[in-house]
Design a protein with these regions (language model features):
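NAD(P)+-binding Rossmann beta1-loop-alpha1 motif at the extreme N-terminus of oxidoreductases
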Residues: 1-50, 116-117, 179-181
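Rossmann-like NAD(P)(H) cofactor-binding subdomain of soluble oxidoreductases
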Residues: 5, 44-49, 53-121
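Glycine-rich beta-alpha junction loops
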Residues: 24, 86-88, 108-112, 194-196, ...
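Small-residue helix-packing motif on alpha-helices
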Residues: 28, 47, 184-191, 213
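Internal alpha-helical scaffold of NAD(P)-dependent oxidoreductase catalytic cores
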Residues: 92-102, 118-155, 166-205, 246
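Glycine/serine-rich anion-binding loops at beta->alpha junctions
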Residues: 108-112, 157-167
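NAD(P)-dependent Rossmann-like dehydrogenase/reductase catalytic/cofactor-binding core
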Residues: 193-249
């Protein structure tokens, strides 16, 4: 996820404002080769010095380690700290630092690399509205950002971050069906992607509810309703809902 954000922010034209810390020197060299103006270091504490916004993007179980490394280098009166780790909320940031601060909890998705993330942001109890606006503006550079209460970041993650995998699974299934009906894999992929893009464009441009769009292409006794009924017989809608809720258990 960190790599996707770095690429996305760099492509937005802000590369000279980014400092990246990672223990993997080879990975840092790859970023530096692609974005020469990018500041890189293997020292987490060094990276946060002078930063306006510190974004910590590691696996949740590594958060205490990384926060411990940067704690002494941070000025929590001035700097904003953002957790991009699943379930590592602003409350956990406050616990790690022993105090409240300008903390935000954000969950983006891997489409950030291409400026197409759907991100969810929540501010901590001690954070100001200005902090929320500044962090939201940062993530708006890599897609759409929705400010929510912290209890909705998890559901948002299931819909938008995990949801990407679920959409990919549907695309794969459509491709498999296309191949079975006679299309080459590349053709089936082209058809599936353009169909998905067309559906998204219809909803964005018209403001329709999905059911309205379905009605536009469904005729009595037609082939579309037969396919829709097969999806219903297979509990397609229920399966999607269960998949979204599964990660919250």
């Amino acid at each position: 996820m960190g790599g996707a954000l770095i690429h996305g922010w760099a492509k937005s034209g802000r590369v000279e404002h980014i400092a990246v810390a990672d223990k993997n020197e080879a990975l840092l060299a790859q970023f530096k080769a692609k974005y020469p103006a990018l500041a890189t270091t293997t020292d987490n504490a060094e990276a946060v010095k002078g930063a306006d916004i510190v974004v910590v993007v590691v696996k949740p179980w590594l958060m205490p380690v990384v926060l411990g490394e940067i704690k002494a280098a941070l000025d929590l009166e001035k700097q904003i700290v953002v957790s991009d780790a699943a379930n590592f909320t602003t409350g956990k940031l406050a616990e790690a630092f022993g105090r409240e601060g300008q903390f935000c909890y954000v969950i983006p998705n891997i489409a950030a690399e291409y400026g197409a993330s759907m991100s969810f942001i929540a501010k901590g109890q001690g954070a100001s509205e200005e902090t929320l606006s500044r962090v939201k503006a940062l993530y708006d550079l890599v897609g759409d950002t929705l400010a929510v209460s912290e209890n909705l970041v998890g559901p948002g993650m299931m819909m938008a971050s995990c949801g990407i995998a679920y959409v990919m699974r549907y695309i794969r299934a459509q491709m498999q069906g296309g191949c079975e009906m006679g299309f080459y894999p590349a053709q089936a992929k082209q058809i599936a992607l353009q169909t998905m893009q067309g559906a998204v464009s219809l909803l964005k441009e018209t403001g329709w509810h999905p059911e309205e769009a379905i009605d536009k292409v469904t005729t009595p006794g037609g082939v579309t309703i037969k396919g829709l009924n097969e999806l219903d017989h297979a509990d397609f809608t229920s399966a999607v809902i269960r998949s979204l809720k599964a990660g919250l258990k």
